[in-house]
């Protein structure tokens, strides 16, 4: 028996969770979603791209809303099939993000006269390396499908609209020294010791908080790794500390890199950028986004982590995270979602899409 998109979204969540779909193994769930949309949502144009399923209405509405969700999960940890205990549904992917997927699919099938045109994007391979992300493939191959006035990504957000996202860079800060026997340490130059001023500056760093569209983004500059040392009797001639800067979306990557260089200016070290991803502005002043905030009763907060909303922002589409799951429960063995939150998310989005 296939998916029943008109069923209660709680039941639909369970049905999706019970289809294993670890990254790179999404064909079965994509087949089920495609078949259900073709049979139960005749007002949508439906296409397939790899193991992603895309659907859209063409009703000539003045605005378009994109509902996007990944259909893959992290590896299963003996946490299938789904089960409901004390008002919570347990199972791999419940929170991240099959509950959100179920809400989107249910609304697509049951709203035949939306006030906005709707584009639905159910994509693969979000939980693994960025180069495999199905959304990136869709952008390359089906760019015209990624057009909207606002995009809603169903990532777990605790029922809040989490607007935009912070950017992230990683920088390796390296120090050079001179190797020597530790019994004659004065003959060497200890590279690890040269990192002490780096750690001092990190410890005393005052992170910036920025209010954008009523969302407060709090930056952070943190050491996340230290490498160094040769042997217990050798003064090391090389050492490094990896620093992660999470920056508010009013900075671009170049500005973030420049800021990190400023923080460590004057020290006897070198800096190498090893990873970078731009953030996304919330864009809540756009009419379609403002209406979404109103429908949510103003329950809005900043998104601190990086998500695929940044991909939409790079395309000029205001984007938010909104899903019934709890981000603190994603990827856990006891991953779960409150069933009442699924109903609440479906009700809120139905109001937004029909009024």
Swiss-Prot record:
One of its GO terms (molecular function) is acetylornithine deacetylase activity. Pathway: Amino-acid biosynthesis; L-lysine biosynthesis via DAP pathway; LL-2,6-diaminopimelate from (S)-tetrahydrodipicolinate (succinylase route): step 3/3. Transmembrane segments: none annotated. Binds 2 Zn(2+) or Co(2+) ions per subunit. GO terms for biological process: diaminopimelate biosynthetic process; L-arginine biosynthetic process; lysine biosynthetic process via diaminopimelate. It is an enzyme of class 3 (hydrolase). Its EC number is 3.5.1.18. PROSITE patterns: ARGE_DAPE_CPG2_1 (PS00758). It catalyses: N-succinyl-(2S,6S)-2,6-diaminopimelate + H2O = (2S,6S)-2,6-diaminopimelate + succinate. The active site is at 72, 126 (proton acceptor). Its cofactor is Zn(2+); Co(2+). Keywords: Amino-acid biosynthesis, Cobalt, Diaminopimelate biosynthesis, Hydrolase, Lysine biosynthesis, Metal-binding, Zinc. Zn(2+) 1 binds at residues 70, 96, 155. Belongs to the peptidase M20A family. DapE subfamily. Homodimer. This is Succinyl-diaminopimelate desuccinylase. It comes from Mycolicibacterium smegmatis (strain ATCC 700084 / mc(2)155) (Mycobacterium smegmatis). The gene is dapE.
